[in-house]
Amino acid sequence: MELKTMPQNGANNGNPQGNTSNNNNTNDSSNSNSNNNNKTERTNWSNGLEFLMSCISVSVGLGNIWRFPFTAYENGGGAFLIPYIIVLFMIGKPMYYLEMIMGQFTSQGTVKIWSICPSFLGVGYGQAFGTICIISYYSSLLALTLYYLAVSFQADLPWSTCRDTWINCVNSRPAEYIETMMTNGSSALTRATDTPAKLQSSSELYFLDVVINEKTDISDGVGNPDWKLTIALFVSWIVIFLVIMRGVKSSGKAAYFLALFPYVVLFTLLGRAVTLEGAVDGIIFFLEPQWGELLNPTVWKEAVVQCFFSLAVGSGPIIMFSSYNRFDHPIYRDAMIVTTLDTLTSLLGGITIFAILGNLAHNLKVENIRDVVRSGTGLAFISYPDAISKFNAVPQLFSALFFFMLFVLGIGSIVALQSTIVTIICDQFKWKYWKVALVTSICGFLMGLVYVTPGGQWILTLVDFYGGTYVVFILAIFELVGIAWIYGVSNFCDDIEFMSNKRVSLYWRACWLIFTPIMMIVIFIYSMVTITPIKYSDIYFPVAGDVAGWLLFAIGASQFPLWGWWYVHNHRTGSIAKSFVDSLKPSQKWGPADPETRRNWLLFKSDLAAKRAVQAKSDKMGFFRQKLYNMCGRST
């Protein structure tokens, strides 16, 4: 995006009105300006709308159109929807708003924000590891999308009709549902009533047999990369590199297109999907609540993970984007807009997919929509193409538009994730941005090769489950604990009040302090205790696969204690115990980056501490009220 360099400004913070606070984060206030002798300048967005559109482009992406439908499909449709909405309000929105605040308040990236609690430095590096895992397989989805985009320009969509070698195949093309291709290559008109084997649509068989050449067993290896998908993967990474090589300076104007164009295609597909026969049954399956599933912890765990993926929480892009805001930018408004629009987009994608699944169930004579197609990451590459093949007018055009849209969404998601990694590296080593972008893009391409093999979908499922799910989940818990429980909600809310000149509502305080961390901890512990061996398409992974998955999780999660130990060991202030306690306190680098804003902030915090100390002494119940305040951040 087009940026302009300027010093950051505070927000009417000379004498802001507000509550009083225990100033436990200013243990180094006497030396607060030692690191700020020179005026710090920070590039800012040229306008707030570009920031908003950029957040929409990363949050409203593959997580909504690709991951949400198959996650809902695997968890019972309406059985998943209710927990997802609850999780959104109790976990998703609070975490999203918190990360926006952290980035804007400090003007720092995912790792350097942990000057707030230095021993939690490993949270930032662990999240970077989880982000790398996500990037590795997201790029393979771009390769699949690019492949489908290329074949969409053929005279006939290649997945719309059955091939001679496909048994029990039903054409996806309209008016040909009952034409089943037999093993001898002859075509016969049959009715599904007497067919003993399960019928499969031509779009599903095309994806499994032609595009990914799926292996049903990886005990002997995953196979060699497919040359067509390898080329598509290479082209995808070239595009990614070209976008990120100049950082955020050139992507602002594109954010308008990246954020708005997908809705045109989505509404077009929705309009066609809801008019198909059986679509109502699919939509009802998606929207009808199944209250009994509220007691299923697996559904809650999947709702949390999907919320993180959809909003890009716990992986760094939100912190990175908001770090380029002016200090007084109204992020509360933007956080509410993005999280609400993200949910509506997920519902839009879900209704579209399940309308198509309802139509497939009708055509394949299947009573249970869960049995229509195999679940998994390929669902979007089966259901959407099947719907497009039913367009009466120029389906090739709609196919090209849809997969171009999916490619754009993928680029928006990966660019944000990849930029997070590049920013972390550049912040640490001060290397040239384009060189880091080039090297990381090459590494991303090499990692992505494993996903374009016949066993690639197995690896994708494994990495998504252990690296993209549990690593992100547990580190998000540590992130919230470090900010809300160790730094303290009261201190955090004081910082927000200083930045926005507004008091923080009880809803946010209660979520950050109680509801969000407790819900996340309970769901995570229960999901770990009741975890079952991972499967792909109802087939269990070999033992080596499970071992590799747990090793992946261990590498990501271990970043937290390892970097914590490193910080304590290298910043000894006495005994190990004293050094550990000191490592839980904010360092001298914590606070606003602009020196003038930082001085005002320190005066603001000091004034609050003095006022609260006076109140505590003058009130017999002051001591207990102060303790209560420190817990929940409410005014005494």
UniProtKB/Swiss-Prot annotation:
Membrane-crossing segments per the record: 51-71, 78-98, 131-151, 225-245, 254-274, 303-323, 337-357, 397-417, 436-456, 469-489, 511-531, 547-567
Region described as Disordered: 1-40
Signal peptide as annotated in the record: none
One Gene Ontology term, aspect cellular component: plasma membrane
InterPro entries linked: Na/ntran_symport, SNS_sf
UniProt keywords, alphabetically: Amino-acid transport, Glycoprotein, Ion transport, Membrane, Sodium, Sodium transport, Symport, Transmembrane, Transmembrane helix, Transport
Cell location: Membrane
Pfam families: SNF
Glycosylation site positions: 184
Bilayer disposition of the protein: Multi-pass membrane protein
Biological process, per Gene Ontology: amino acid import across plasma membrane; D-amino acid transport; neutral amino acid transport; sodium ion transport
Gene Ontology MF annotations: amino acid:sodium symporter activity; D-amino acid transmembrane transporter activity; L-amino acid transmembrane transporter activity; neutral L-amino acid transmembrane transporter activity
Annotated PANTHER family: SODIUM-DEPENDENT NUTRIENT AMINO ACID TRANSPORTER 1-RELATED, SODIUM/CHLORIDE DEPENDENT TRANSPORTER
Assigned protein family: Belongs to the sodium:neurotransmitter symporter (SNF) (TC 2.A.22) family.
Function: Unusual broad substrate spectrum amino acid:sodium cotransporter that promotes absorption of the D isomers of essential amino acids. Neutral amino acids are the preferred substrates, especially methionine and phenylalanine.
Protein name: Sodium-dependent nutrient amino acid transporter 1
Gene: NAAT1
